[in-house]
């Protein structure tokens, strides 16, 4: 509105200026001629008089022109003052909000390690049932052993899965006292070949490794999709596992399926690794017992894995190289999560090392200390969270057995432990089996 008023003022000034010049021109044309000299032909006969008259007219015109210049200057000055007084600041165009570019989700293949169990169908059925996207989660079944019935089961899925076969089915030369471990040698050879295919042939950036006797939870894919960026960003992590070694039903909080932890123990049994880690491990991959080899300090290098409160995998395979002993004693009791958790919508930054160490250690060592006997007899029920302190290998094993958690150690690291601390539920109470606060590292001689 103000801009229109200012423009109108300029227009009127210009009109007045033009009108004034028109009147001036009319004035000169209609101005009466001054009285002549006595002789009517005096001016015509006297050139000097004519010159004086022309000069006088020119001077009059110059004076009038100067007055017009002054008038025009006043118009300009008044316009400038008016514009300054009523000037409306020109608002800068609103800045476009910065919308972060969300990278497309990574393609994370599921590598199923198969051999001679036709029950791989149960594993594949669950994977395909819960898989949200065939493009984001291609399923690659790598088969060893040359078992034809298992091969037919895998082939029956057609293009829903990719079937690859480990070509070297020969026996492996081993020491005489290791002949009974031939199966462990073949497993290590198969893992090396299959992971090589994933990262060198298919060129994937990461992979989730699943054995053929595992059943997955409804949010299995959601869990790994959400934790993949965390694994990529945090160099203090080297894997994400779907497994809680102490995940028996009575030892987990079923009301908190979203709860995740860091652990120094390599759990396996459905785990995510990056191509960069495989590039590090492949040149020194062991000939046998690959999982225990992963748990050695030379491979772990102080790094941790992410693990859930409630397992996202469950093993149903009693048949295997361990002859079912570990399955009967422990594995079959692990609870499989059934409640879908939208992990990709949750803030998982609490799992980054600095924040996690600060908060987790404050919680553990801020909990009241209670003797193991009082925990077992459920004394001090009002204490919903307690700490049981051990001081050495023997006391750890004794307390772990008394409380029902796994008591074995691999290179000094307890199963599901973080900084020596094992967290679980006992009779509905949160218990931290922990070393003294002065703990300064694992002792690899503890086994």
UniProtKB/Swiss-Prot annotation:
The cofactor is mostly bound to the substrate. Substrate binds at residues 117, 144, 190, 212, 322. It holds the Pfam family GNT-I. One of its GO terms (biological process) is mannose metabolic process. Mn(2+) binds at residue 213. Keywords: Cytoplasm, Disulfide bond, Glycosyltransferase, Golgi apparatus, Manganese, Membrane, Metal-binding, Signal-anchor, Transferase, Transmembrane, Transmembrane helix. Disulfide bonds join 115-145, 239-305. It is a single-pass type II membrane protein. The active site is at 291 (proton acceptor). Its EC number is 2.4.1.101. Its cofactor is Mn(2+). Residues 1-6 are cytoplasmic. Signal peptide: none annotated. GO terms for cellular component: Golgi medial cisterna; Golgi membrane; perinuclear region of cytoplasm. Coiled coil: none annotated. GO terms for molecular function: alpha-1,3-mannosylglycoprotein 2-beta-N-acetylglucosaminyltransferase activity; manganese ion binding; protein N-acetylglucosaminyltransferase activity. InterPro entries: Glyco_trans_13, Glycosyltransferase_13, Nucleotide-diphossugar_trans. It comes from the Eukaryota. Residues 30-447 are lumenal. It is found in: Golgi apparatus membrane; Cytoplasm, Perinuclear region. CDD domains: GT13_GLCNAC-TI. Belongs to the glycosyltransferase 13 family. PANTHER family: ALPHA-1,3-MANNOSYL-GLYCOPROTEIN 2-BETA-N-ACETYLGLUCOSAMINYLTRANSFERASE (PTHR10468:SF0), PROTEIN O-LINKED-MANNOSE BETA-1,2-N-ACETYLGLUCOSAMINYLTRANSFERASE 1/ALPHA-1,3-MANNOSYL-GLYCOPROTEIN 2-BETA-N-ACETYLGLUCOSAMINYLTRANSFERASE (PTHR10468). This is Alpha-1,3-mannosyl-glycoprotein 2-beta-N-acetylglucosaminyltransferase. It comes from Oryctolagus cuniculus. The lineage of its organism: Eukaryota, Metazoa, Chordata, Craniata, Vertebrata. The gene is MGAT1.
């Amino acid at each position: 509105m103000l801009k229109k008023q200012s423009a109108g003022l300029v227009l009127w000034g210009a009109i007045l200026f033009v009108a004034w010049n028109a009147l001036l021109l009319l004035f000169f044309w209609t101005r009466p001629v001054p009285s002549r000299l006595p002789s009517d032909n005096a001016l015509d006969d006297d050139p000097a008089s004519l010159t004086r008259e022309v000069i006088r007219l020119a001077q009059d015109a110059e004076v009038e022109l100067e007055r017009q210049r002054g008038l025009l200057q006043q118009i300009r000055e008044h316009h400038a003052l008016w514009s300054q007084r009523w000037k409306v600041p020109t608002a800068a165009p609103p800045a476009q909000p910065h919308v972060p570019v969300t990278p497309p989700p990574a393609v994370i293949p599921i590598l199923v390690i198969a051999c001679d169990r036709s029950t791989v169908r149960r594993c594949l059925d669950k994977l395909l049932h819960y898989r949200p996207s065939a493009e984001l989660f291609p399923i690659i079944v790598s088969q060893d052993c040359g078992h034809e019935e298992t091969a037919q089961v895998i082939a029956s899925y057609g293009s829903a899965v990719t079937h690859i076969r480990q070509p070297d089915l020969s026996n492996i030369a081993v020491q005489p006292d290791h002949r009974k471990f031939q199966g462990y040698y073949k497993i290590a050879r198969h893992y090396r070949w299959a992971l090589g295919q994933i990262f060198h042939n298919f060129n994937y950036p990461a992979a989730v490794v699943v054995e053929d006797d595992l059943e997955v939870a409804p949010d299995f894919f959601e869990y790994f999709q959400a934790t993949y960026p965390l694994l990529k960003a945090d160099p203090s992590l080297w894997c994400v596992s779907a497994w809680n070694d102490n995940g028996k039903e009575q030892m987990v909080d079923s009301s908190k399926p979203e709860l995740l932890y860091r652990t120094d123990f390599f759990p396996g049994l459905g785990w995510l690794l990056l191509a960069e880690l495989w590039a590090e491990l492949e040149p020194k991959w062991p000939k046998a017992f690959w999982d225990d080899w992963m748990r050695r300090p030379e491979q772990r290098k102080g790094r941790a894995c992410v693990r859930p409160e409630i397992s996202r995998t469950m093993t149903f395979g009693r048949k295997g190289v361990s002859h079912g002993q570990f399955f009967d004693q422990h594995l079959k009791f692990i609870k499989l999560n059934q409640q879908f958790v939208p992990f990709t919508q949750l803030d998982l930054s609490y799992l980054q090392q600095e924040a996690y160490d600060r908060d987790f250690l404050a919680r553990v060592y801020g909990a009241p200390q209670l003797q193991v006997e009082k925990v077992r007899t459920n004394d001090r029920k009002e204490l919903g969270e307690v700490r049981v302190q051990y001081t050495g290998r023997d006391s750890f094993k004794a307390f772990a057995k008394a409380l029902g958690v796994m008591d074995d150690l691999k290179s000094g690291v307890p199963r599901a432990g973080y900084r020596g601390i094992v967290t679980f539920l006992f009779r509905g109470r949160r218990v931290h089996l922990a070393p003294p606060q002065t703990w300064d590292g694992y002792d690899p001689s503890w086994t």
